[in-house]
């Protein structure tokens, strides 16, 4: 896991729910590659064809609201999304995504600072988001060390496999 993520931004609005991230009709599979073929289809039916490895989703408030389903962050990660940056996240989505190793960053005003396809740089530890096309830099909430450890391991399960009970020590 890199501290700094650079990619191409895809901008969505407020209240993107888990049904928009991965429509319910695809919940019959657990295969990440199959889920990736339908990621964000509920918000933009053409998105699965446009997204590339390393892209970053930018959105408004309450991203990941709705039903609690691990399929949503699994689909995003499998599609190559490197990070999701929003004004705010639904709490259960936030926990699921971090636990699965998908970086999430809270950044006020981020959805107003980007257009689809613009270059984006996200610094997870220092807490900033930069529009590489305009030069605009926004303050974001840096991720705490314990979350970075989860992300660096590839998720909570992988961290526990690697460190055992030490994973929960200060």
Swiss-Prot record:
An individual GO BP term: L-leucine biosynthetic process
UniProt GO MF annotations: 3-isopropylmalate dehydratase activity
Record carries keyword tRNA processing: no
Pathway assignment: Amino-acid biosynthesis; L-leucine biosynthesis; L-leucine from 3-methyl-2-oxobutanoate: step 2/4
Keyword terms of this UniProt record: Amino-acid biosynthesis, Branched-chain amino acid biosynthesis, Leucine biosynthesis, Lyase
Domain of life: Archaea
Pfam families in the record: Aconitase_C (PF00694)
Family matches, as InterPro entries: Aconitase/3IPM_dehydase_swvl, AconitaseA/IPMdHydase_ssu_swvl, IPMI_Swivel, LeuD, LeuD_type2/HacB/DmdB
Coiled coil found in the keyword field: no
Catalysed reactions listed for this entry: (2R,3S)-3-isopropylmalate = (2S)-2-isopropylmalate
UniProt EC number: 4.2.1.33
Group of enzyme by EC: lyase
Quaternary structure and interacting proteins, as annotated: Heterodimer of LeuC and LeuD.
Family the entry assigns: Belongs to the LeuD family. LeuD type 2 subfamily.
Chain's role: Catalyzes the isomerization between 2-isopropylmalate and 3-isopropylmalate, via the formation of 2-isopropylmaleate.
HAMAP family: LeuD_type2 (MF_01032)
Protein name, as recorded: 3-isopropylmalate dehydratase small subunit 1
Organism from which the protein derives: Methanopyrus kandleri (strain AV19 / DSM 6324 / JCM 9639 / NBRC 100938)
């Amino acid at each position: 896991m890199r501290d700094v993520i650079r990619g191409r931004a895809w901008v969505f609005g407020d209240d993107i729910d888990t049904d928009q991230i991965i429509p319910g009709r695809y919940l019959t599979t657990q295969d990440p590659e199959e889920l990736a073929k339908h990621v964000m289809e509920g918000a933009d039916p053409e998105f699965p064809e446009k997204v590339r490895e390393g892209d970053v989703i930018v959105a408004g408030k309450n991203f990941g609201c709705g039903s609690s389903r691990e399929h949503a962050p699994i689909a995003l990660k499998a599609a190559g999304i490197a990070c999701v940056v929003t004004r705010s996240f639904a709490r259960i989505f936030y926990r699921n995504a971090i636990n699965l190793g998908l970086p999430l960053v809270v950044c006020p005003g981020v959805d107003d600072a980007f257009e689809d396809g613009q270059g984006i740089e996200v610094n997870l530890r220092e807490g900033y988001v930069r529009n590489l096309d305009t030069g605009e830099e926004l303050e974001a909430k840096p991720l705490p060390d314990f979350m970075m450890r989860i992300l660096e391991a590839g998720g909570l399960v992988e961290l526990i496999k690697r460190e055992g009970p030490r994973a929960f020590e200060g």
